Amino acid sequence: MGRYIVPALLCVAGMGFAHAQSALQPIAEVNLFRREPVTLGQIKARISAIEKEMGKKLSTAERRQFMDSLIDEKLFAQAAEKAGIQVTDAEVNQYFNGMLSQQIGRAVTEAEFANYVKEKQNISLDQFMKQQNGMTMAEYKKFLKTQVSTQRYVAQKKADEFRNLKGPEDSQIRSYYELNKQAFFRPDTVKLFLISVPKGSGPAAAKAKAQEFVKKLKSSGVKATADIKSKANGAQAGYSAGEIYLGKTAVTATQLGLTMEALLEIFGMGVGAVSDVNETANDYQCFIVLKKEEAKILTLSDLVEPDKTVSLYEFIKNLLTSQIQQKALEDAIREVSAELRKSGTYKVFLADAELGKVLDW
């Protein structure tokens, strides 16, 4: 049998070489000021990531569009580099942290989000990113860096157009409100002053501390909250305290890890009422009810969030302004892309029919 081993190994090695050769095959080339290939491996990696995120297989025509976007991405990256536009790793991390924060609705660092993912799903942040969009964290940050540099390059090229953008008119703001009025429903809300005492290594002491807070709140009421809150900022305080708003919704109950019945009990308490000590997996909590508001559809003059300063009118104005700016940016990117492609700065090596076959995997 020995005489068959070497040919078999050569066959396996040849298959591996063919695969590598296929992945490294240049499908196109970008050359604004530096020759840079667009390989089949890069195209497959990007399209696989997009298909994973979209949850479906793309058609050959759609894959061609995303291949073209990869060419544009490399053109923009070279154009930004040539123009001296730089994006630091610190800036990329800031954008990345902002995106992570949006996912869980509060400000978090990369390390905090990694702990959150580990706790909830028992996977690493790298694995989480791979599941979400098919890219590792390093790959996604590189992609994000290119996106930021592209936006800055386009903003520089189209500075005059962006400066002359007009915001939404009053009639547009009011029309948007009328058409979307039901979306501005605010459920019954309750404002609590909440105290959390982490169990740490001494759960008995933590519970005793929470019970002391309950006594203090029942004795002095709202007057006690200022002192409790100010002392919570100390490094050795051993607890946190502050105001929170809760909406009477199933989403709120889920976010807090409460049953709907438990949430309704909170809403059944009157203003000034103090809770007993409640135990969770990580801490002991207690609270006093500060304020209650009935459900309503917000008017344009209402505040979007209680205790904040932004009215619904300003909120809609800002929203429409962002939409105008986003559309202007997308239009500008298309225009600059067309300008970059005019000068023979890229080349696709395969004819349409052959390219269609390559993209049909």
Swiss-Prot record:
Keyword Cell membrane included in the entry's annotation: yes
Keyword terms, alphabetized: Cell membrane, Membrane, Signal
Single GO term (MF): peptidyl-prolyl cis-trans isomerase activity
UniProt keyword annotation of Transferase present: no
GO terms for cellular component: plasma membrane
InterPro entries (alphabetical): PPIase_dom_sf, PPIase_PpiC, PrsA_foldase, Trigger_fact/SurA_dom_sf
Compartments where located: Cell membrane
Protein name: Basic membrane protein
Organism lineage string: Bacteria, Pseudomonadati, Spirochaetota, Spirochaetia, Spirochaetales
